[in-house]
Design a protein with these regions (language model features):
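Polytopic alpha-helical membrane proteins, predominantly small-molecule transporters/carriers
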Residues: 1-285
Length: 285
């Protein structure tokens, strides 16, 4: 049962991280430099947080480093696409596209390649969240909105790949390292890539105001701890159970946060959130 508590906490943290991501984009734009600056700071800070949580001990294997490197590339693309998509999406709609990809692809991966059971509650959960997502999508008006649709699909696919890589790593016990070491290695890879990008492209390291660093530190804490909790849960829970819970939970928390921030989600979004909540409860019990 405690693993479900971990996932609920992770849901809340992932929902909050969207808020800090959105604030960064508003102040710094959504260009390539901004995306790499965002990733450099957040992953550097997250690495330090995980290093402390792991007792200043890190383990490495060739398999973990390889998966971490691929994972890092996916995260960079995901970060850039996320910043670009915020130019038209509100918090609840963006999170729905992100989390749906994070649910469906790992779900299918677990069922097809790891022979996880495809039960009636799981099928009902997938169907309900699919309906919720379709209801929540609000077609943009104008060429700018249509042009950003590609970024919605990008975060859909890339977040799904994050789940697949996590499942792949955690399912190979003889080759993988502990969850804290793996996520710290991922963060270190992203930080190194972003630092190299700035040194080659701009010949300098971007410096941000203390207030902005604080905002990114909040994002890093939410992302780093949330991903760590998910990896710990994934050592026991099937991907076909875990990722629907994450998806439904984030949809619910994100919509609540949107209401608190007076973004006024539509009636369809509220109904979709209720459906997501029911589907999450269904797969847990």
């Amino acid at each position: 049962m405690y693993l479900y508590v971990f996932l609920i906490i992770a849901d809340l943290l992932f929902s909050l991280q969207f808020l800090f991501n959105q604030q960064f984009r508003k102040r710094n734009g959504d260009g390539l430099d901004s995306a790499f600056t965002f990733s450099m700071y957040t992953n550097g800070i997250s690495f330090l947080i995980l290093l402390v949580l792991n007792g200043f001990k890190l383990s490495f294997t060739w398999f973990s480093v390889l998966i971490a490197f691929i994972y890092a590339l996916v995260l960079l693309l995901y970060s850039y696409s996320g910043l670009k998509s915020f130019s038209t999406a509100n918090l609840s709609v963006y999170s729905i596209f992100t989390m749906l990809g994070g649910m469906l692809l790992p779900f299918a991966f677990g069922v097809i390649f790891y022979k996880e059971d495809f039960t009636l509650p799981k099928a009902a959960c997938i169907l309900l969240i699919g309906i919720a997502t379709a209801m929540s999508f609000e077609k943009g008006k104008g060429s700018k909105d249509r042009g950003n649709l590609k970024y919605y699909f990008a975060v859909f696919i890339l977040n799904g790949l994050v789940g697949i890589l996590s499942k792949l790593h955690q399912s190979n016990a003889e080759l993988c390292v502990d969850s804290g070491s793996f996520m710290a290695t991922v963060n270190l890879c992203v930080f190194a890539m972003c630092l190299g990008f700035h040194l080659v492209r701009n010949k300098k390291v971007p410096l941000l105001p203390i207030k902005e660093v604080g905002n990114l530190a909040c994002y890093a804490a939410c992302s780093g701890i949330g991903n760590l909790l998910c990896l710990i849960a994934l050592t026991t829970l099937p991907a076909s159970v875990q990722y629907p819970i994450i998806t439904g939970g984030v949809m619910v928390f994100s919509t609540v946060i949107s209401i608190i921030r007076k973004e006024k989600p539509s009636v369809k979004t509220l109904i979709a959130t209720a459906i997501a909540f029911v589907s999450t409860i269904l797969i847990m019990f």
